[in-house]
Amino acid sequence: TEIWAGLVWVCMDDDAPSFDEYIGPLKEQIEHYRLEEMVVVQDQTVHLECNWKAVFDNFGELYHVEHIHPQHALIFDCPTSRVRLWKNGHTSVYIDGFTVNTRLDIPEEPTKLMRGQLESLGMDPEEYRGRVLDVREDVQKTRRDMASQLGYNYDRLADEELSDIFQHNIFPNMLITLQPDKALLMRARPHKSDPSKCYWDKITLVMPPNEEAEISADLQFMPKPKPIPEERPEREEFTQEDVIAGKKTMDITVDQ
């Protein structure tokens, strides 16, 4: 058993390598996001009608994205994503954010989804008519400048980590998707008796902002963050059919 990044890691093999040896370079790829300072705001499990390996493998490739997640073309450049292979079966995926699919026609003005992103940072979408591809770099600068005023600490993060999606798939069944002040932990678990079924867990973490910094800077968080729960939320469990029927959601991308 090992405690790292605010998580408890368990291995039941007495002959397994140490945690540090097993996770290898991924440790330095993840730890500067300060997961241990984040708090759980949502804990969900969906019961899926597929083998646990199938759903986990889906997150390791990007060929499906343009067909299954068409909205990503409006906020990410998935065709230029990079996939890195690590020892022990781990992989990483790096996706440019605050941009558009550069293999398609570049829009003259920010997309509707991108406009919402810009407005949430206090940026004017109208300033990016004819220069949509400048948004990503300007978002990096804006977040860097606003961080100390709004109570976030991005000192350990590189510029691209302020705009892009960094996803680390930890063999055999867990992945971590990282953003500057948010992380998604997702995990596939085998069904106890039926190999054609599994459980898919999604835990959402957020970095609580410093409210005192907001007051002293005379600025507001945009949008206002949801209140941080005082206690860990109870796990919400539902079925694949609940998601298909629109009764439950993990988020649009995971649902798809």
Name each region found by the language model.
Residues E2-I3, L7-Q256:
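C-terminal catalytic domain of Rieske-type non-heme iron oxygenases
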